[in-house]
Amino acid sequence: MSALTDLTIAEARDGLRAKRFSARELTDAHLGAIEALNPRLNAYITVTPDQARAQAAAADRVLASGEAGALTGIPVASKDMFCSEGIRTTAGSRILENFVPPYESAVTERMLRDGAVILGKANLDEFAMGSANLTSAYGPVENPWKRHDDDAVLVPGGSSGGSAAAVAAHLALGATGTDTGGSIRQPASYCGIAGIKPTYGRCSRWGIVAYASSLDQAGPFARTVRDNAILLRSMAGHDPRDSTSAMREVPDFEAACQRGVKGLRIGLPREYVADGMSEEIRTLWQNGAAMLRAAGAEVVDVSLPHTKHALASYYIIAPAEASSNLARYDGVRFGHRSSDNRDLNDLYERSRAEGFGAEVKRRIMVGTYVLSAGYYDAYYLKAQKVRALIARDFAEAFRSVDALLTPTAPSAAFAQGETIDDPVAMYLNDVFTVPINLAGLPAMSIPAGLSTTGLPLGLQIIGRAFDEETVFAVSAALEQAAAFTHRPALRADTLNAGA
C-alpha cells in the first residue's frame, strides 16, 4: 500500500520531525491499508477516519511549530477495552454494542496529549476473556501469518488479538492492549511482534473496562522493542483517579534499550520445562539463553516451585473478580436492555442472557461459585494464599538474578476451531504468562524464531517490579541477536503485490 506503513514508530517520529512526510500522509496511508485489509482480518471493530484525520491535522500544526510531543502524528490502534470519549466502546460484547463513553481512559488521554493519532478501536475477546480472539461478539480476528503447508485461518492470540494483528499487518504503527493473564504477550508471540505487560500499577486502569481488577494492566504493542519503549513512556504515570496507580517517576525506557546485558544474571526457571513441551519451543528457549550468554550475560537455573499451581489459582481469582465487576451490567444503567420483560428480575436475567457470550457466562458462573459461602475458603481464599506463595517465589529468584527468560507460549498460533470446544485446552495457552500477572511483575514477549511450519515463536523476559528498564535492556539485546526479520503474508505493504 505504502512505504509509510512499513515504518517503525522511531522512524516515523524522525521522518515527521524532518518533514519528509506529513502526519496526514502517514495517517491516510494507514487508513487506506485498514480499508483494504480489515474486511478480511477484522482487526478493528470501529474505525474512526474523521477523528484520525482531525488529529493528524492538529499534529501537523504542532510539528510546524517545532514543539512535537513524544507521539505527535503517530497512528495507533486502541484496544476496545479503553474508553474513548464520544466513540463507541464495546469490550467486544453485545451488552455494550451501543455504549458511548462520556470520558477518555487515562492511558489514551496521555497518548492523545502526546500527539498520537488514534485510528480506531481494535477487536478483542469479549471482556478480554479468551486466548484466541474467538469470543468477540463482532467476529473473530484473523492472524496475518500463514503456515507454509496450508492456508488455514490462524488465531492471533487473545485477548488483545485485534491490536496484535493490526500492528503485525501494518494497519497501525503501535497499539494499546491489556494483559490480565497473558493478553498482550501471547498475541505478540502469535503475531510475530513485541509487546510488554508493565508492572501492576505502572499504567492507570481508569477508563479501562474492568475484567479482573487485581490483575488487569495496560501495555503497548509494536514491531520493535524500542517502539514499545516509546509507547510505554507515554502511557505510564501516576493517576489519582486510580488508587492502584503507582506514585513513581516514569523512566526513559527508550534509553534503557541501549544498555546491553553485559554483567547481568539471567535465570531460567526449571519449572517452566512443562510436561509435553515441544522440541521446537525447548530449542527456541535454549537458543535464547545462548544468545544472551554471547551478549555478555550469565545464565543460571532458578526455581519457582509454586508455578505448577498458577493456572489453577488464576482461573479461580480472575473469574471471581469478573463475577463482581460484571454485576454492573444489568440492563438498567447502561448497555444492552432486553425488551418485553415481566418485571425487574426478568429484565436483569434477559439483558444479561442476551448480552453476554458463552465464555463470559462460563467465567461469571465459576466466579460466583468460588465466592459462594460454602466454597469461599476452599477455593478463593486458598487461591489467594497460593498467589502469595507465587509472588514470594519470584522475589526469592530475583535475589540472585536480574531477569528471567522463558518461552511466551507453549506453541505457535493454531487454526480457528482447533481447540475452541475444549475450554481447558484454551486456558493452557496461558501457562507461561499467568504466573507473572499473579505476582504483578513486568514481562515482555519478543519474536525470536519460527516454528517448523513458518510461524513466529516468542520468548518472554520477566523483570523485578518496576524494573521495566532491565526488561527493555534484555529484550533489546535478544532482539538484536535473534535478528527476526520475517513478516506475515497479509500486510499493508504487500497489497499492491496482490498478497
Curated annotation (Swiss-Prot):
The keyword Glycoprotein does not apply. Its EC number is 6.3.5.7. InterPro entries: Amidase (IPR000120), Amidase_CS (IPR020556), Amidase_dom (IPR023631), AS_sf (IPR036928), GatA (IPR004412). SUPFAM superfamilies: Amidase signature (AS) enzymes. It comes from the Bacteria. Pfam families: Amidase. One of its GO terms (biological process) is translation. The keyword Secreted does not apply. GO terms for cellular component: glutamyl-tRNA(Gln) amidotransferase complex. The active site is at K79, S159, S183. Allows the formation of correctly charged Gln-tRNA(Gln) through the transamidation of misacylated Glu-tRNA(Gln) in organisms which lack glutaminyl-tRNA synthetase. The reaction takes place in the presence of glutamine and ATP through an activated gamma-phospho-Glu-tRNA(Gln). NCBIfam families: gatA. Heterotrimer of A, B and C subunits. HAMAP family: GatA (MF_00120). This is Glutamyl-tRNA(Gln) amidotransferase subunit A. It comes from Granulibacter bethesdensis (strain ATCC BAA-1260 / CGDNIH1).
